[in-house]
UniProtKB/Swiss-Prot annotation:
Job of this protein: Gives rise to a blue or pink color to bacterial colonies. May have hydroxylase activity, resulting in the observed pigment production.
Entry keywords, A to Z: Oxidoreductase, Pigment
Organism annotation: Rhodococcus sp. (strain ATCC 21145)
A Pfam family annotated for this UniProt entry: Acyl-CoA_dh_N
Listed SUPFAM superfamilies: Acyl-CoA dehydrogenase C-terminal domain-like, Acyl-CoA dehydrogenase NM domain-like
Name the record gives this protein: Pigment production hydroxylase
């Protein structure tokens, strides 16, 4: 596959009107529509980060961010699932080369869902492991072909070993649990496994992945694949936040132009308060985009300190700050949308709910991220399993 960044972005922009039109149906469906997944596959978007060795595009993380930000501006749920499906091609490289080749055997993309939350039971057996448990927040589960699970192996005389497990869809059960106020269209259902056998080659050393040094990562010469897990995960979620904020600001502009008082019949656009609130919204969207660009510049700079937990914590805080900025901006906007702005058909209320949920995601929680940096700064113990 050989597509330039410009060609790929042209394809993305061509899909945006359809994704915007489907936004409300996506929310009602609680997952992306089948035709949306088909569009993502046929356009080549999902091969953005797949190594060229497996037929992918192997474009930069900044390209993936542009794609996700653009889609999220019209439908944050679609942008979120797109980001995780694109990112799955990177995360698969945490596993062995044999597992990678299995996943990409017949196509240059992978529909993979999963979380980093540990399973309840992992047992070492001949040739692999048996896993049992249930995990939540599996975005993209409805269309996923593979699932990833984290777990800790306890063997007598050895330190606990955190591993990642790769499991085909036929070995898991997707539970219909995704009923939530925001990001409703992501299909982030619970997933369960019951005494499922996972061969050794479908496991990855999660502790090494946290530092970007899993053997499966290192077989690829492109340094993009050598990033630590957490900063990469931040690179998946932050473009959704920034795109959603831009979409909200655009929706607020339109809402301000259209809104008319019920009693006075005065147009909202003629009020100084509305004009000031609109200015703040646009400034916040611009600031978020600038901060996102700086985040990716730092992420891709190939700095030696990237393997240091403090540096990873700083990247997490930068991402959380972006989410906090977006939520505060939305809180300000919705004070000026009137009652009609909360109708189900009004895009602005969907952005408000989506960003409210995004901002409390485990990776984007400002309180936790701030506390961690505070503890590092004060030379206090830090216990974050993802650092």
């Amino acid at each position: 596959m050989d597509i330039t960044r410009t060609e790929l972005m042209d394809r993305v922009h061509a899909l945006v009107p359809a994704f915007a039109e489907r936004a409300q149906k996506t929310e009602e469906n609680r997952a992306p529509l089948d035709e949306t997944i088909t569009d993502l596959i046929d356009s080549g978007i999902l091969a953005t980060l797949t190594p060229k060795e497996y037929g992918g595009l192997e474009l930069g993380l900044d390209v993936a961010a542009d794609i996700v930000r653009t889609i999220s501006a019209v439908c944050p749920s679609t942008g979120w699932v797109t980001s995780f499906y694109i990112g799955a091609a990177w995360r698969v490289n945490i596993f062995t080369e044999q597992a990678q080749r299995e996943v990409f055997a017949d196509k240059p993309y992978t529909l993979t869902a999963g979380t980093a939350a540990p399973l309840g039971q992992v047992q070492k057996v001949d040739g692999g492991y048996r896993i049992t448990g249930q995990t939540a927040w599996n975005s993209g589960s409805v269309h996923a072909e593979w699932f990833t699970f984290a777990g800790v192996v306890f063997e007598e005389g050895s330190a606990p070993t955190p591993l990642w497990f790769l499991v085909p869809r036929e070995d898991v059960k997707v539970l219909d649990t995704w009923y939530i106020a925001g990001m409703s269209g992501t299909g982030s259902n619970d997933i369960s496994v019951d005494d499922v056998f996972v061969p050794e080659y479908r496991t990855g050393p999660f502790a090494l992945a946290l530092a970007g040094t899993a053997p499966g990562q290192l077989i690829h010469p492109n340094p993009m694949y050598h990033l630590p897990f957490l900063p990469f995960a931040m690179a998946e979620v932050t473009p959704v936040v920034v795109g959603a904020l831009r979409g909200a600001a655009d929706a607020f502009v339109q809402r301000t132009k259209d809104r008319q008082g019920t009693i006075s019949q005065e147009k909202a656009s003629g009020k100084q308060a509305a004009q000031m609130r609109l200015g703040r919204a646009l400034a916040a969207a611009d600031a978020a985009e600038t901060l996102l660009d700086a985040f990716f510049e730092r992420l891709t700079a190939q700095r030696p300190e990237q393997s240091d937990p403090r540096d990873r914590a700083e990247m997490k805080l930068k991402a959380a700050y972006l989410a906090d900025l977006a939520r505060n901006a939305l809180n300000d906007m919705v004070r000026g949308i009137g009652g009609d702005g909360y109708r189900n058909s009004a895009p602005i209320q969907r952005y408000f709910r989506d960003l409210s949920v995004l901002s409390v995601h485990a990776f984007l929680d400002i309180d936790t991220a701030s506390e961690t940096i505070g503890r590092f700064t004060l030379d206090l113990p830090v216990s974050d399993p993802l650092l």
